[in-house]
Amino acid sequence: MAESGGGGGCCPPMDLMRSETMQLVQLIVPMESAHLTVSYLGDLGLVQFKDLNSEKSPFQRTYAAQIKRCGEMARKIRFFRDQMSKAGVPAKEMQGKENDIDLDDVEVKLGELEAELVEINANNDKLQRSYNELMEYKLVLQKAGEFFSSAHRSAADQQRETESQQAGEDLLESPLLQEEKSIDSTKQVKLGFLTGLVPREKSMVFERILFRATRGNIFIRQTVIEEPVIDPNSGEKAEKNVFVVFYSGERAKSKILKICEAFGANRYPFSEDLGRQAQMITEVSGRLSELKTTIDAGLGQRNILLQTIGDKFELWNLKVRKEKAIYHTLNMLSLDVTKKCLVAEGWSPVFASREIQDALQRAAVDSNSQVGSIFQVLRTKESPPTYFRTNKFTSAIQEIVDAYGVAKYQEANPGVFTIVTFPFLFAVMFGDWGHGICILLATMYLILKEKKLASQKLGDIMEMAFGGRYVILMMSLFSIYTGLIYNEFFSIPFPLFAPSAYDCRDVSCSEATTIGLIKVRDTYPFGLDPVWHGSRSELPFLNSLKMKMSILLGVSQMNLGIIMSYFNARFFKSSVNIWFQFIPQMIFLNSLFGYLSVLIIIKWCTGSQADLYHVMIYMFLSPMDELGENQLFPHQKTLQLVLLFLALVSVPCMLLPKPFILKKQHEARHQGQAYAPLDETDESLHVETNGGGSHGHEEFEFSEIFVHQLIHTIEFVLGAVSNTASYLRLWALSLAHSELSSVFYEKVLLLAWGYNNPLILIVGVLVFIFATVGVLLVMETLSAFLHALRLHWVEFQNKFYEGDGYKFAPFTFIFTANEDE
C-alpha cells in the first residue's frame, strides 16, 4: 500500500482534514465472471481502474466489437429521444431493473422499432412534402389568377375605350386604321410566362438578376403572401412572394429557369384559361384534404409507436449506457497468459476492501464461476489519487477548493476551514442583515425544493446556484450576523438590543452631529451603536474600525495557513520544513504584521491617540528614534528592535539551510551513510524519484533546488506585505456596500416619499427594489464572492497548500444514469 506519511496524530481525526488512505489493488478475475464483476464494482463505485492496455488503440482491444454494438444502440436511443422531443411525447419513469433485461433482446427490439419509425417518418415526409407543394401551388393559382383576371378586365376596358374613340373619327381614316391593324396583327410576338414562389428576402435581387440576364426583355410581377408558407424542400416556414415572369424566346426561358433554380424559387404550371384555373384550384383543394387526412393518420400511428418506446426508454437507455461503460472498463483489463483470466489494477480506499471482496464473491456466485476472483494489495511508489468523502453540504465547498487545485495525497485540506471562513469573509464585505434575509429566503426555496429541482434540467446560472445552495445558506447566515454587528438593515440602523448609550445634552443638540452627545447608559451590548449612523464622524469611525478589523482577520488567517504547513510537515515527517520553513515564516510574519495586530488591539483597549502608520514606517526607516507620543507601552522601542532583527534573520533561514541539507542528505544516501540529525524529507524523496529515471544514481540538481527555494522565499517575503494589504478589500467592499445601500435608501426611497405623491412613491419603491436586487443582491453578492474566493485561493492557501494532486475518479454508474453522452 502506498502511503506518503504516517504522522497523522497531530490532528484530530476528521474525514475532511486528510484524504482517505488509498491502496493499489490487483484483481484477477475469471473470464466467465468478468462482466458481472465489473458491473458490481460499478454499482459500488469505489475502484478507479488503471488502463493496462494504453499502448493499444481502441480498435485493437478485446471488447471493441461489443462497444461498437453499444454505440449503435446508443445512436438509436438518441434518435428515439429526438423524435419523442419533436413529437412532445415524454419518457415515462423507469419501471423494473435493467438487470432483468438481456442486451441482445434490447438490440433486436431497438432495431425493429427504428426500422418501423424510419419507415413511418419517410412516408410522412413524402406526404408532407406533397402537401406543402400543393399548398404553394394553390397559392400560385390564387395569386397569379388574380393578376390574370385583373389584366383581362383591364384589357377589355381599354379595348372598349379604344373602339368608342375610333367610332367618332373621320370615316376616311378608317380604312387606313384597319390596314394598320392588319399589319400589326401579323407582326405580333408570342409571349411565354413562368409562375412560382421565391423567398421574400431574395425577391429584389431575383428581379434584378432576371432583368440583367435578359437585358430587360422580360416583364415580371410579384405579389406578397401575407402568411408564411412551409417550404417543401426545407420543411421550415418562410416568407415568400408569388411571381409571374413574361418572356419572349426559348433562350430567355432557359436563362430564367437557371436563375429560378439558383434562387431556390419553386415553379408551378399555370393555365391562361380562367375556367381551367378554377378547375385546377378545385382539384388541388380536394387533393389537399385527402393528404391532410392521410398525414393525420400517419402522425397518430407514429405517436402510438413513440409512446410504446417512451414506456421502456429510460430502462433501455440505462441498460445500454451501463453495458457500454462496463465494456470500456473491461478493455482496460489485460489478459493473462492462459487467456482464461483478466487482470485488473486500480486504486481504492482502504476502508472499501471488505466491500470490494464481497462484490467479487457475489459476482463469482451469480455467474456460476468455478473459480473465484483474487484480490490483493500491491506495493507501489506511485502517488495515489486524492479522495474526500463529502456530503451535499460539504461537496460545494470542496469543489471551490478543488477548482484551485486538487490536494496532494493526504495533504491538509483547506476545505475544513473554508466551510466557515469563506462565508464569514464574504459576510464581512456584505454586512447587512436585511440583504442577508433576502438571500436566506431565496436559498431556503432552493433547499426546500431540492428534490424537485434535482430531477429537472436547469439553466447554467440556476444550476450553479442550486449546486452551491448550502454555501449560499452559510453566506446569508453570516451576512445576517455581520449585519447585526454593523447595525445595518438596508442601511437603516435599529436599536434592537438596547437603547443607544448616548443622548443629547440638551434640546438644541442635533442628531447629525456627535458634539454634545453624552453617555447616559451602558455601552450598546452587541454591534455598532445606532447613534453613529448619520453622524458627522460616522465615516471616519467606520473606516478606522473596518480597516483595522480587516488587518486582524487577514493576519489571523495567514497565521492559520502557516500553522497548517507545520501539520503537513509533521505528517509527512519533514523536519527540514518545520525548522527552516514553518518557524522562520511564523517569526517573519508575526514580527511585522503580528506586532501591528497587537498594536491595534492595545490602541483599542487604551484609547491611545498613537499614529500606527508612523510607528510601523519608522520602525524600518528610523528604528533608533524615540517614539514620543506614539509610544503605546513601556520598552516598545526595544521590542521593535528585537522584532526587526528577528524578521531580518528569518529571511536567510528560509533561503539557505534547506537546499544544503537536501544536498547533504542526497550525498549521504548514495554513500550508504545515514544522516542522523534530520529525518528523510518529502522533498528529498521527490528529487530522488524524479531526478534520474531508472539509473542507479539519480542526478541531484542543486541549482534547481536553490532557485526554487529562492523564489519561494522572495514570494513569501513580498507576499507577507501584499497579502496583508490584499485583506483591506474587506474594508473597501464593506464600505462600498454600505454606501450604495445608503444612496439607494436616501436618494430613491426617501426622495420619492418626500413628494407626497402616490404615483411617484410607487415608482420610487419599484426603482428601489430593482436597484437593491440588481445591484446589491446580484452584482455585489457576486463581487464579494469573487473577492472571498481570491482571499482563500491566494492569501490563505499559498501558505501551505500545494494542490498538485489528482482526483479519485472511480468507475461508477451514478452519473451514467443522469448524464447525456
Swiss-Prot record:
It comes from the Eukaryota. InterPro entries: V-ATPase_116kDa_su (IPR002490), V-type_ATPase_116kDa_su_euka (IPR026028). Its main location: membrane. The modification N-acetylalanine is found at residue 2. Belongs to the V-ATPase 116 kDa subunit family. V-ATPase is a heteromultimeric enzyme composed of a peripheral catalytic V1 complex (components A to H) attached to an integral membrane V0 proton pore complex (components: a, c, c'', d and e). This is V-type proton ATPase subunit a3. Residues 2-421, 491-548, 603-640, 780-821 are cytoplasmic. The gene is VHA-a3. It comes from Arabidopsis thaliana (Mouse-ear cress). Residues 97-144 form a coiled coil. Essential component of the vacuolar proton pump (V-ATPase), a multimeric enzyme that catalyzes the translocation of protons across the membranes. Required for assembly and activity of the V-ATPase. Involved in vacuolar nutrient storage (e.g. accumulation and storage of nitrate) and in tolerance to some toxic ions (e.g. zinc ions sequestration in vacuoles). GO terms for biological process: proton motive force-driven ATP synthesis; vacuolar proton-transporting V-type ATPase complex assembly; vacuolar sequestering. Residues 443-469, 570-581, 662-758 are vacuolar. Keywords: Acetylation, Coiled coil, Hydrogen ion transport, Ion transport, Membrane, Phosphoprotein, Transmembrane, Transmembrane helix, Transport, Vacuole. Expressed in etiolated seedlings hypocotyls. One of its GO terms (molecular function) is proton-transporting ATPase activity, rotational mechanism. It is a multi-pass membrane protein. GO terms for cellular component: chloroplast; chloroplast envelope; Golgi apparatus; plant-type vacuole; plant-type vacuole membrane; plasma membrane; vacuolar membrane; vacuolar proton-transporting V-type ATPase, V0 domain. The modification Phosphoserine is found at residue 174. Disruption phenotype: When associated with VHA-a2 disruption, day-length-dependent growth retardation associated with a reduced accumulation and storage of nitrate ions in vacuoles. Increased sensitivity to zinc ions due to a lower zinc ions sequestration in vacuoles. Reduced calcium content. No effect on sensitivity to sodium ions. The chain crosses the membrane at residues 422-442, 470-490, 549-569, 582-602, 641-661, 759-779. It is found in: Vacuole membrane. Pfam families: V_ATPase_I.
